[in-house]
């Protein structure tokens, strides 16, 4: 049965091929040359009507966000620049008591603060800055021989801290939007916080600075003077204003401020101070003279045998006491020499009943 059906299919195959040929011949297809022209016309209409010519152009705000901030200079500028927005800083007034944790000297333009203690700084502007403006704080060394070095925390304080920015000296407290940066070219570290307009009833905006290392820390500042540069910048890094002030991180800000202010006011009378310091050790001289006098009052034999030791604090006092001792010794030597000369000049005493006749004098018998 299967074979019969297969044979029947083979018998009708030629007929089916004839039918397909007739069908293919009946299909109307354009030539290849006309297809290319029609496609070009259709594509041109599509690009002209529905294609956005600005598809690959980014909006200006996206270009600003993706742009790279130009590298900062090796030697930072430390001069004040209020700019068109009248950028100013104000510090809270505080005295020189030992209990204060932060105090600012208007005379020296210098901030004294304790380690890791917040120091409020008020920012005052004459008009509203551009949208997205930020405040940046950077620490640099004051003296020219150290200005190229990067200000960092000492290794001891870094190991005690677990924060990601533990190497940064300056921190901005009280804001979750503070960002810490390190310049890839100069390796200088800075911290930024968005500028916030003053609250109702106030004309200033306050930020909280804290310094995480003492000025005397070995391996860190190592007693080198530092400056804090506070700048008002656009999101692109363009500086709109700049203010600089010196900072000393110490254990007793009030005491150090008072000492520095007193020394600065006495600077013109510096030579007089040195004279007073040189004369001060003379107060201890009477004690040494009493010792020397007690020695001179004793017999000559005891003076030669006994040795006294006087403990002196300070090189200047030692030199003064040494000169006094040398003067006494010189006087003693002169006294001894004078006594020897006097003994030699003494005339021999004649025996009893006789009188010594001087040269050129006649005796009674003559």
From Swiss-Prot:
Bias kind Basic and acidic residues: ranges: 255-264
Site description Interaction with DNA, residues in chain: 98
GO CC annotation terms, alphabetical: cytoplasm; mitochondrion; nucleus
Interaction with DNA: annotated span: 248-255
One Gene Ontology term from the biological process aspect of the record: protein tetramerization
Cofactor note: Binds 1 zinc ion per subunit.
Region (Basic (repression of DNA-binding)): 341-362
Family: Belongs to the p53 family.
Name used for this protein in its record: Cellular tumor antigen p53
Organism: Platichthys flesus (European flounder)
Lineage per the UniProt record: Eukaryota, Metazoa, Chordata, Craniata, Vertebrata
């Amino acid at each position: 049965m299967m074979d019969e059906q297969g044979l029947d299919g083979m018998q009708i195959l030629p007929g089916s091929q004839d039918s397909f040929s007739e069908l293919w011949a009946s299909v109307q297809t354009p030539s290849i040359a006309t297809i290319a022209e029609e496609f070009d016309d259709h594509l041109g209409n599509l690009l002209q009507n529905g294609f956005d010519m600005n598809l690959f152009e980014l909006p200006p705000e996206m270009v600003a966000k993706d742009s790279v901030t130009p590298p900062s200079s090796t030697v930072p500028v430390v001069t004040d620049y209020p700019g068109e927005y009248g950028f100013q800083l104000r510090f809270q007034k505080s005295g020189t008591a030992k209990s204060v944790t932060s105090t600012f000297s208007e005379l020296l333009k210098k901030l004294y603060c304790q380690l890791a203690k917040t120091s409020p700084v008020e920012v005052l502007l004459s008009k509203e800055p551009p949208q997205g403006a930020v405040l940046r704080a950077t620490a640099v060394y004051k003296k020219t021989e150290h200005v190229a070095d990067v200000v960092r925390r000492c290794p001891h304080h870094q190991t005690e801290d677990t924060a990601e920015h533990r190497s940064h000296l300056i921190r901005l407290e009280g804001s979750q939007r503070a960002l810490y940066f390190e310049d890839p070219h100069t390796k200088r570290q800075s911290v930024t916080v968005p500028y916030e307009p003053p609250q109702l009833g106030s004309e200033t905006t306050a930020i909280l600075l804290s310094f995480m290392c003492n000025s005397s820390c070995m391996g860190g500042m190592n007693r080198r003077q530092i400056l804090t540069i506070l700048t008002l910048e656009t999101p692109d890094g363009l500086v709109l204003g700049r203010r600089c002030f010196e900072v000393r991180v110490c254990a007793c800000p009030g005491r150090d401020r008072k000492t520095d202010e007193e020394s600065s006011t006495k600077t013109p009378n510096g030579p007089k101070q040195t004279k007073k310091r040189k004369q001060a050790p003379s107060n201890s001289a009477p004690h040494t003279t009493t010792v020397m006098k007690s020695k001179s009052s004793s017999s000559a034999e005891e003076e030669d045998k006994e040795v006294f030791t006087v403990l002196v604090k300070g090189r200047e006092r030692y030199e003064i006491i040494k000169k006094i001792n040398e003067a006494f010794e010189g006087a003693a030597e002169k006294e001894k020499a004078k006594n020897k000369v006097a003994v030699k000049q003494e005339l021999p005493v004649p025996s009893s009943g006789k009188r010594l006749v001087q040269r050129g004098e006649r005796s009674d018998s003559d």
